[in-house]
Each structure stands twice: as structure tokens, then as C-alpha cells.
Amino acid sequence: MAKQGSKEKKGYPELKEVIKATCKIRVGPGKETLTEGNCLWALKTIDFIFEDLKTEPWTITKMYTVWDRLKGLTPEETSKREFASLQATLACIMCSQMGMKPETVQAAKGIISMKEGLQENKEAKGEKVEQLYPNLEKHREVYPIVNLQAGGRSWKAVESVVFQQLQTVAMQHGLVSEDFERQLAYYATTWTSKDILEVLVMMPGNRAQKELIQGKLNEEAERWVRQNPPGPNVLTVDQIMGVGQTNQQASQANMDQARQICLQWVITALRSVRHMSHRPGNPMLVKQKNTESYEDFIARLLEAIDAEPVMDPIKTYLKVTLSYTNASTDCQKQMDRTLGTRVQQATVEEKMQACRDVGSEGFKMQLLAQALRPQGKAGHKGVNQKCYNCGKPGHLARQCRQGIICHHCGKRGHMQKDCRQKKQQGNNRRGPRVVPSAPPML
């Protein structure tokens, strides 16, 4: 039993490196990462659900098979949260198995969903394309749109190597950096509009920056509508953004202009947000000082946001978000205590009401009192605990004045481990040794 228990403890040795990489993925922006226990829970749960796949090794093919089967299941109302956690954890493991490094669980789910849609489209049309163009494999590259010798075009998903490289650049230099802009402009020349926008959404970056980028894209779309009235040969905003098109349709030659315009809009949005970030008075750089009251900080922040040339929904989002993230540590703690879980969605007025006393003498005295106050039951432990030697409360056994009492024979002057009566008994009453082992999983 002992050997069997130690063998089971190893878990899934073929996924050791995959689980290690998965443990670097965060549950959400700024939140904790997944743990090895989360991964093992997901893998063992899947083994119990699909017993016919339990003996097969954990390859990417098996993971996709499990993913497809999970989509066909309908969990009970009480198990929906656990089922969603199971799918999310599996998506993270699949990304790690493919060598991708998503920053959050949501990004991993987006990657798998995108690849799944691309795979379905590829399987539906793959057989027909291979029959028409038998030499297709000779012309495949890292680009989604492939020109064929026999004429026409074929679409291929963005390579994971390219996606991972863009993700690394975004994490190291920033989403709106010049390095990321150059990399995106280089690879996206042969991407469809849908590919460009989906890759941009799944890149790691500041939420406020992503909202500003989306706002700039909306401004470009509105400008296009004003300058290009509807006509027979005029591209619509939906065509430029790839809305309502299949990947095969978006890869054809008649959509080249739309793809170029979409890429130009994205680059313009990245540059606008980058210039905004480096310009004096940038709202994201307005942070509360140590000696500054929350009201004065909010006044500076709102003035900077109102001066930005962005739409009202973006301004509202920046006010709600930055009024918490750019506040001081004391104000953030006070908002957490007062507003609880809805602190991120609370209005600026509610946050000002919560932080009105931060920095005052009364607030400082309250913090000092909390720091000196005993924490929970631990503060009263020494008062209520009884002495194991004499049985009286108010002191510990090592502080007892009545001397040491043997808990085996009841006499004073020695401890239980030195008791002679205990040594004389030997091991006659000792039973067989019990080896601890993990219980069987039901």
C-alpha cells in the first residue's frame, strides 16, 4: 500500500513542465496565479468524467477531444461554477501544452475559442481546397493568407509562434510601445481584419489603454462614415472591421483594401494612445500623493480626464477605474472596507464619501488602535488557556510553580518520557505499525 500511495502521488509526470507553465497564468489581471492543485483537480475530474480516455496519454489531441466533449455536457444549476472552472483550467493547460503563454485565464479561453473556430472552418473547407490545389503544402507560410499557384487564395490561422512573440513584446515593452507597433505592422500585412482585432484583444496590457484604443477605433470608424457616404463601390465599416465575413471571404483579393485600412486604424490608435501616455497631464499618470487629500486628487484626476479628446463613455470608464487604481494605499484600503466587492464599479461620489476622513487625526488614531488591538482569539489565548500541569488557568505548563508532573504515573519530579514504569512495560502492548496512505478516490 505504501508503494502504491507514493506512486499515485506523482500525478501526471508527462505534464510536469506543462503544469509548471500553467501555474504562471493569473486568474485575472493583478490576481493570484493558478496552482498545481488546480491543475491536478481538473485532470483528475476529467479522468472520472471520461473513463474511456483515462488510460490514454495527455496529448494535445486528447485535450481537444475532452474539450469537445465538455462542450456537449449541460451541468446542473449547482455545478455551473465548478464546470466553468474546469473548462477554464483545461484551456490554460492546453495553451501551455502548445507552448503559448497567456497572461490570464480569460486570455487562454479566448485563444482556445479562436483556434477552435479556425479549426472548424479549416476542416469544413480543407478537403475541397486540397483537391483543387494538391500542392498547397508547398506554399504554406506563417501568414494566414496564402497565394496558390493555381490561382485564388487560402486562409490559415495565425501561427502560435508569431502570437507568442507579439505577446512577449507587449509584456516587455507595453501594448502601445513602438516595438509592438513595428512587430504588428510587420506580421499583420497579410492578416484578415478579424485576425488583427482578435490578436489585439488577447494581448496583455492595461485595461484603460485598451479602452482608449477601442475609443480611437470608434472615432476612425465615425470619421470614415462621415467622409465616405454609402455607395455601390464604397467599403462599409463592417467590411473594414471584418464583421459578418468568414475567414475565407476576408482573405480574398477584393478585401485587400479593407484589411489595409483596418491595420492603419489600429496603428493610428496605438500611436494616439502612446502620445497620450507620454504627454504631460496624462490621466493614467495622475496619482495621489502621500500628503494629498482624496478630494484634491480627484479634482486633478477629473480635470485631466475631461481635457482628453475621447468620447464620454471612455471618460466615464477612466474616472471609475483610475479613481481607485491611482489612489493611495490608505484610500484603497478604506474603499475596500467601506464599499466591499463593488469598489471597482462604485461611482466617484461614493468613493469620495468613503475616503472623506482619510488623513485626519481621527483616522490616524483609528489605525493606531487597530494596530494595537489583539487580533481575534489569539489575543486572549494566554488569559483563557489552562496549564496542562496543574489544570489551573492563567499560565502555561512551563510557567507552573508546582513542579513537573509525569502524565504516565502521576508522580512529581520527572516527565513522561523519563518515567521508569513506562520503560518497564516495553513494547508488549504496542500493536502492528500502521503505514499512512492516501484513501482511494471515489
Curated annotation (Swiss-Prot):
A zinc finger (CCHC-type) spans 385-402, 404-421. Signal peptide: none annotated. It comes from the Viruses. One of its GO terms (molecular function) is nucleic acid binding. Transmembrane segments: none annotated. Residues 420-442 are annotated as: Disordered. Pfam families: Gag_p24, Gag_p24_C, zf-CCHC. The gene is gag. This is Gag polyprotein. A motif (PTAP/PSAP motif) lies at residues 436-439. Late-budding domains (L domains) are short sequence motifs essential for viral particle budding. They recruit proteins of the host ESCRT machinery (Endosomal Sorting Complex Required for Transport) or ESCRT-associated proteins. Nucleocapsid protein p14 contains one L domain: a PTAP/PSAP motif, which interacts with the UEV domain of TSG101. GO terms for cellular component: viral capsid. Belongs to the Ovine/caprine lentivirus group gag polyprotein family. Keywords: Capsid protein, Host-virus interaction, Metal-binding, Repeat, Viral budding, Viral budding via the host ESCRT complexes, Viral release from host cell, Virion, Zinc, Zinc-finger. SMART domains: ZnF_C2HC. InterPro entries: Gag_p24_C, Primate_lentivir_Gag_pol-like, Retrov_capsid_C, Retrov_capsid_N, Znf_CCHC, Znf_CCHC_sf. The record marks F363, K364 as: Cleavage. It comes from Maedi visna virus (strain 1514 / clone LV1-1KS2) (MVV). GO terms for biological process: viral budding via host ESCRT complex; viral translational frameshifting.
